[in-house]
Amino acid sequence: MPREIITLQLGQCGNQIGFEFWKQLCAEHGISPEGIVEEFATEGTDRKDVFFYQADDEHYIPRAVLLDLEPRVIHSILNSPYAKLYNPENIYLSEHGGGAGNNWASGFSQGEKIHEDIFDIIDREADGSDSLEGFVLCHSIAGGTGSGLGSYLLERLNDRYPKKLVQTYSVFPYQDEMSDVVVQPYNSLLTLKRLTQNADCVVVLDNTALNRIATDRLHIQNPSFSQINQLVSTIMSASTTTLRYPGYMNNDLIGLIASLIPTPRLHFLMTGYTPLTTDQSVASVRKTTVLDVMRRLLQPKNVMVSTGRDRQTNHCYIAILNIIQGEVDPTQVHKSLQRIRERKLANFIPWGPASIQVALSRKSPYLPSAHRVSGLMMANHTSISSLFESSCQQFDKLRKRDAFLEQFRKEDMFKDNFDEMDRSREVVQELIDEYHAATQPDYISWGTQEQ
């Protein structure tokens, strides 16, 4: 029984990474840019209907909803070879097309105004599914639409579909240099509050780390957005392979999430991918084995979140799920896991079992691949809190001076006061504290002493 997933793409970033994701899915399932199954794609072992549905004329159409408050990116999608792939009724552009001006409050309050139009689309998609499992939301947390409208949708989805899972792919902004959005720290924290309270699972895509990987590992001098988005679509498609090429384990979203998230608030995941090479000559020198892939996945340089090394806290893994694609001998998996445990290659939480799981998945039969085995790691690691800490520091710098708050005052929500910002700051601080507490053996009783 396929459990369908509806993808919601918001704002410039969400629609760009969503576009790459669908491009990748079409390639993997042998679907042409018009949505027609290619002649060669006759192996019926993949599950297309988790992410696509078939129209009356046998076209495959993505279960995707494209939302933006300004038209540029969606117009570029509609002028691309993939224009006919999407259902035009599922594309929503706001009437005035002015965007949210990189302002969370504007995105959020526009969400309230266009709420009915958006939920008409989402409800129609949900009704068209046999047994909907949940929603996947692609957005960035720094701008206006992805963060503001994204936050609004997260809250409403919880009210409207309380039993459905909500997973997000959230792009975090650059940390080291000045961003082009001055109010980015405000936008980020306000969105983080919703990601903490209203999402079941957040896959963190950190621009800083993605850039580093593109530069160091793929040897691209100045990586462009589209090159980084390709990295992101690789992660997104690899993290859904077990849903699309089902095996006996992890073949639905709850199975993936349940193995990674033992306690509800600590649901921010980082990813790692290997082998990453664009250089064909280098690719052929090594024989990729399961152990090789799993060991590489644990190396910080392959992890797509840049976290600071914190001397005070012993950061550790809460859980790991490795999705290994390719020709794999299952006995090798067991040996590799044993080797990792014996050599203590990964440092796990003191209050629970060392949960490192492996899901084996087939590769797409239609895509040539340079490597026999490739792997994606999805890890729940306490050091992700350093990402939130740096967001908080940037927020505090601005909030202390009440800098750049004029645009926020224009919206009803912040007309009289900025309580919502300070509340968000508290929620994120509690999240950081809980991640720190999770490194201690007494975490199980954490939070019970205070009451």
Swiss-Prot record:
Q: Mind listing the UniProt keywords for this protein, alphabetically?
A: Cytoplasm, Cytoskeleton, GTP-binding, Microtubule, Nucleotide-binding, Phosphoprotein
Spell out which residues are annotated as carrying Phosphoserine: 131
Residues annotated to bind GTP: 142-148
> What is one GO biological process annotated to this record?
cytoplasmic microtubule organization
Description of post-translational modifications: Phosphorylation at Ser-131 by BRSK1 regulates centrosome duplication, possibly by mediating relocation of gamma-tubulin and its associated proteins from the cytoplasm to the centrosome.
Q: Name one GO molecular function term.
A: structural molecule activity
Q: Does the keyword GTP-binding apply?
A: yes
Recorded hits in InterPro entries, A to Z, give: Gamma_tubulin (IPR002454), Tub_FtsZ_C (IPR008280), Tubulin (IPR000217), Tubulin/FtsZ-like_C (IPR037103), Tubulin/FtsZ_2-layer-sand-dom (IPR018316), Tubulin/FtsZ_GTPase_sf (IPR036525), Tubulin_C (IPR023123), Tubulin_CS (IPR017975)
Question: What GO cellular component is one of the record's annotations?
Answer: microtubule cytoskeleton
Compartments it resides in: Cytoplasm, Cytoskeleton, Microtubule organizing center, Centrosome
Which Gene3D superfamilies does this chain map to? Helix hairpin bin (1.10.287.600), Tubulin/FtsZ, C-terminal domain (3.30.1330.20), Tubulin/FtsZ, GTPase domain (3.40.50.1440)
Q: How does it assemble?
A: Component of the gamma-tubulin ring complex (gTuRC) consisting of TUBGCP2, TUBGCP3, TUBGCP4, TUBGCP5 and TUBGCP6 and gamma-tubulin TUBG1 or TUBG2. TUBGCP2, TUBGCP3, TUBGCP4, TUBGCP5 and TUBGCP6 assemble in a 5:5:2:1:1 stoichiometry; each is associated with a gamma-tubulin, thereby arranging 14 gamma-tubulins in a helical manner. Gamma-tubulin at the first position is blocked by TUBGCP3 at the last position, allowing 13 protafilaments to grow into a microtubule. Interacts with alpha-beta tubulin heterodimers; the interaction allows microtubules to nucleate from the gTuRC.
Q: What does this protein do?
A: Tubulin is the major constituent of microtubules, protein filaments consisting of alpha- and beta-tubulin heterodimers. Gamma-tubulin is a key component of the gamma-tubulin ring complex (gTuRC) which mediates microtubule nucleation. The gTuRC regulates the minus-end nucleation of alpha-beta tubulin heterodimers that grow into microtubule protafilaments, a critical step in centrosome duplication and spindle formation.
What the record says about family reads: Belongs to the tubulin family.
Protein name in UniProt: Tubulin gamma-2 chain
Q: What is the lineage of its organism?
A: Eukaryota, Metazoa, Chordata, Craniata, Vertebrata
